[in-house]
């Protein structure tokens, strides 16, 4: 029977220690390699001027995007809501309402669109919402926050889904009786001699004792990105928004390419309405407003299930 000498035993211990140390070094180097790899991601946002404004510094290469190589997917909000359900994009803008129908998503703290005592409105040739229950209303999508706000405020209505930009003219041409309008149309509807008959922003402000109106949010798929990557992208988006606010004229110029022939003055006004302090950082009030929206939808039997709301931090 062979015996291991104390010298051999010491060698085995030293060899094992060296092997552990070498494995540790390799893992550290591999981790560094992985962390330095370029990660290609698809990021969805709408063609609305406020969304374009937020992404100006990122899309123009004016700030570092870290290890992310970003492909911008620019589509209507309802299309982005539907893409989110299928996890087609790593990061995307969605309606706050749409979050209730998603799973495995985290809400970013930056990039949200919140109204401050203003928001979607209902327009018509009529002077009031009297008898609206028997009328047809054009809506920009059944998963939009505007539609959820209207449903909470006014109950179940006869609605027709339309491209949001077509709604004002549809009212003008008597294709629908009322129109639920979002985006720049909130400012330009009066050019068509149409009437504002219900202001959902004012209604929300009064109903919730002054919470901001939760409209659009940015989410990241936790199926496609890990928590560190989500936090990192959140920081990049926040840096972009801050840069753009500090370079307002240049960022507005960039936004005009998505402006749908809207004047620069209107675009600037709309951007300054919806790119605000809550866009840079959602803060506790922004989070409270999202929770309140979901809570009110449940109490009105619009949402049937509990919704777990997760934030990047």
Predicted features, each with a name:
Residues 38-60, 120-177, 182-184, 288-292:
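Bilobed "Venus flytrap"/periplasmic-binding protein-like clamshell domains
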Residues 41-42, 104-113, 136:
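A structural signal for short loop-to-beta-strand junctions that line the ligand-binding cleft
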Residues 50-54, 62-95:
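Extracytoplasmic small-molecule ligand-binding "clamshell" domains
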Residues 108-129, 206-223:
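Hydrophobic/proline-rich hinge and linker segments of small-molecule sensing/allosteric domains
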Residues 165-256:
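Pocket-lining segment of extracytoplasmic ligand-binding domains
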Residues 226-296:
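Secondary-structure end/capping motifs
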């Amino acid at each position: 029977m062979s015996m291991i000498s104390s010298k051999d035993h010491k060698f085995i211990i030293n060899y094992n220690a060296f092997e552990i140390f070498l494995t540790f070094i390799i893992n550290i180097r591999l981790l560094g390699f992985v962390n330095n790899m370029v990660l290609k991601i698809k990021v969805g946002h709408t063609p609305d001027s406020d969304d374009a404004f937020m992404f100006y510094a990122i899309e123009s290469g004016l700030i570092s995007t870290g290890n992310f190589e970003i492909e911008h997917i620019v589509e209507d909000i309802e299309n982005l809501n539907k893409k989110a359900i299928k996890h087609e994009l790593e990061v995307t803008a969605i309606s706050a309402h749409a979050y209730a129908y998603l799973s495995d998503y985290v809400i970013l703290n930056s990039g949200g669109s919140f109204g401050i005592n203003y928001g979607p409105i209902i327009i018509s040739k009529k002077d009031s919402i009297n008898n609206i229950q028997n009328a047809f209303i054009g809506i920009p999508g059944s998963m939009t926050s505007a539609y959820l706000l209207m449903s909470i405020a006014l109950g179940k209505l006869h609605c027709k889904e339309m491209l949001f930009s077509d709604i004002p003219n549809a009212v003008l041409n008597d294709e629908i009786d009322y129109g639920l309008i979002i985006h720049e149309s909130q400012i330009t509807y009066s050019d068509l001699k149409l009437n504002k008959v219900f202001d959902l922003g004012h209604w929300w402000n009064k109903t919730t004792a002054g919470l901001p109106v939760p409209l659009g949010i940015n989410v990241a798929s936790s199926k496609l990105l890990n928590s560190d990557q989500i936090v990192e992208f959140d920081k990049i988006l926040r840096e972009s928004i801050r840069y753009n606010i500090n370079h307002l004229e240049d960022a507005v110029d960039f936004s005009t390419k998505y402006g749908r022939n809207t004047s620069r003055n209107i675009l600037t006004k709309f951007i300054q309405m919806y790119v605000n302090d809550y866009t840079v950082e959602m803060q506790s009030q922004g989070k409270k407003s999202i929770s309140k929206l979901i809570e009110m939808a449940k109490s009105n039997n619009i949402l049937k299930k509990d919704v777990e709301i997760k934030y990047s931090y």
